[in-house]
Amino acid sequence: MSHKTPNSLVGMLKSGRLDIIGAVGGLLAALLMLPLQLLASQVYIQTLPLVLGVASILYLLASRTDSASTIATLTPQAARLLPSLSVVGMAALVGLATFQGGRTLLYYDIAAMTGMMVMAQVFFTDDGEFSPALILTQVVLLGLVVRFTALMTSPGYIGIDVWTHMSNWTAAIYQTQSLQPIADMKYFASPLYHLLVAGAALLFDIGIREALFLSLAIAMPISVLFVYSTTKLLVGVRWAVFASTAYALIGHVVEWGIHLIPTSLGLVFFLAILYSLTRVLHLDYKLRDFVLVVFFSVAVILTHQISAFIMLVFTGAGLLAQFALSFGLFNPRMSSALDFSPQDTVNLSGLIAFDLGLITFMWSLTPYQGGTFLATIFSYLENTISSSAGFLALAGPDGSTGSAAAGPQHGTTLMQEVVKYLDVAGFLLLLLFTIVGSMYILRRENASHATFTGVVATVAMLVFVFGFPLFGIRTFVPGRWFAFLAAPMAVIAALGVAFLVKNLTPRTAVVLLLLFTVAFPTVTALASHGTLDSPPLADTQTRYSYTDAELAATGTIADIQPDNEEAPLHTDHPYQTVFDRREGQPVKAMTVTNGTASTANETIVHRTYQQKGAAYVRDTAGFAYQPSVSQQQACSGTRDVTYSNGDVTMCTTVGSDGGS
């Protein structure tokens, strides 16, 4: 073990080290943020101060020593055995999903253990036995297994938006071999997703569902290699493997691998931009490298509007980082500002101008809700700021979809509280290491254009994810940002982990890595975002896939129920979205008060899941909550059953427009 020389915290502060100032400032900020917990119960308000405080303390502890240390590693026999065991675990996952007809709690337990074995190889394999290719192969295979066992055991599709994109738009494009069916939709100007799936279906002569799985579903787990390639430019190979492994396991990333919509394809292109732009910023790049950045930028713009805006924020962070470094804002006492050639500045400024110009042009021509997409978004933003924005304006009956916070009169159960923290734990663990990595980069000799771009991009994206929603501004759809944000976070986190392992005492480093190895795969495997098809905690986490009987009922009910906007169907969320997006049937959220459907003349569609699962309904104030509603409660009063297939029942009031 190498000798460690303690450094004085006061001395480092007096020397003007920006990283130490940042760590102390982070600790103070965490303390100042604690009173917010008394004002709001939102999960991130409750947890972010703790994460920031712990990260700051870890960095200060590690900064007190200068020389490297070595940690305990696996024996050669164990290092060679773990890859085989992880492959056995993946085979068990396939077998379980096949024989049990879906992903169960046992499945998720084995998935978590498999993730632990992969992560243990990253952290504890000796340099002589460490094989990046072998571990990355396991990461990609595990990603494929997790995603395809979900997709192949779920009838139809998983999620909400996918029903519109596939059942309506892609199907119509496939049949007509033209974009005319979406000429009045916003995706007419961003059709790459629909063209990819329709083109794959035509090329391979298969259905559009199979084409979606064979194209985008395969690309999603493979795209994590962009994170590895990006991180390898900045830090050692071991920590690059860590970045890709952690990113692949995050529930938000798994979500877009099973809920396959334009966001998914936009994420693939964003990861390609992350790698290609980092390469341009970090190396003596050639013209082809910059052309790749432009190519993937155009691809994102032609795929998805939100993804394009996120890409614009990321590239803008690169320009902002360049200005900050060129003006010597880090620590002018230690050295001169970093030098940038005029070509670097012109190229990055030109890229921003090109992306912004193309986005503005495309959005100005994109039809959306009777106007253009650009004008509509600005109108939404202006309306939000003028009417509902305010500090801690976090929730309301119309603030989001069916997963909105329950009203105050309903409260939350213990399991709902557990799930609330379980869903964010994986992201917060990664954020902890990201904060450490950001502080490490703030030290002048560790800063480069590429690494500082990652820090600036992460901070900017966190503002859109947490900052604006804190004031009630949700126009930028913050829920879509997490998988994109996790990519630069994973890169910066890799630098943070490498720093901690090098500078903490071996015992402390091993304890920290062991805790992460056990906790991170467990919480990410059980998180709601990555288990939309079959949640492990079925009575608390909402299922966003459907049984054969539930899907059959939507078609039959659409055939027998007249399309009447004045007398829509009423059912739970998310089941209502299938009627709307797949069948074009007028539908509203079911209102339930005191255990019964509240309005006597509503046509109710009840499914068994409303009693046994975690479906959302509304109360009379418009808040979403998850009561257990039996068929007798839903079809109470004067309603008669007009359709039933054993799992789904439709009941209407005698004399109403309600089928036959």
Positions of PLM-derived features:
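Active-site lumenal/periplasmic loops and adjacent helix-entry segments of GT-C-fold
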Residues: 128-268, 479-484
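Internal/C-terminal transmembrane anchor helices
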Residues: 133-139, 348-361, 505-528
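Start-transfer (signal-anchor) and selected internal transmembrane alpha helices
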Residues: 2-28, 44-46, 59-149, 351-352
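Membrane-interface transmembrane helices that cradle and orient dolichyl/undecaprenyl
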Residues: 271-288
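Membrane-interface helix-loop-helix junctions at transmembrane boundaries of multi-pass membrane enzymes
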Residues: 284, 333-346, 421-426, 432-461, ...
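Extracytoplasmic
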Residues: 68, 269, 479, 495, ...
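Transmembrane catalytic cores of multi-pass membrane glycosyltransferases
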Residues: 39-41, 159-161, 258-266, 287-291, ...
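Hydrophobic/aromatic-rich transmembrane helices and adjacent perimembrane loops
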Residues: 108-112, 309, 473-502
